Swiss-Prot record:
Keywords: Ribonucleoprotein, Ribosomal protein, RNA-binding, rRNA-binding. This is Large ribosomal subunit protein uL23. It holds the Pfam family Ribosomal_L23. It comes from the Bacteria. SUPFAM superfamilies: Ribosomal proteins S24e, L23 and L15e. The keyword Transcription regulation does not apply. Part of the 50S ribosomal subunit. Contacts protein L29, and trigger factor when it is bound to the ribosome. GO terms for cellular component: ribonucleoprotein complex; ribosome.
Length: 105
């Protein structure tokens, strides 16, 4: 699998925002390819950001039922989420606003 196709995009929710700011280790969350393992995610992260993560945790989200106007329920997409834990003191700019703020300094 190509390293550029492992990490699809950042995953930002209220929960991930609170996880990121809760501890001394910065935790980043990404949606990754469903077939990617932790070693591939680590290599892709190093290739993209140039930083070595401390730890990587993954979880698979099942499709959830959603209401539709018909009698048959719809489903959300299944996804694999990677939680990338960085060493103490290492900051990574993931969002567009963070990159612009880092460039302004």
């Amino acid at each position: 699998m190509e390293l550029t196709r492992v990490i699809l995009h950042p995953y930002t929710t209220e929960k991930t925002y609170s996880i990121r700011n809760k501890s001394e280790h910065e935790t980043l969350t990404f949606i990754v390819d469903k077939n990617a393992n932790k070693y591939q995610i680590r290599e892709a992260f190093i290739a993209i950001f140039g930083l070595k993560p401390l730890k990587i945790r993954t979880t698979n989200r099942r499709p959830a039922k959603i209401r539709t106007s018909t009698a048959r329920p719809g489903y959300t997409k299944a996804k694999k989420i990677a939680y990338v834990v960085m060493p103490v003191g290492v900051k990574v700019a993931v969002s567009k606003e963070e990159v612009e703020a880092a460039n302004a300094k």
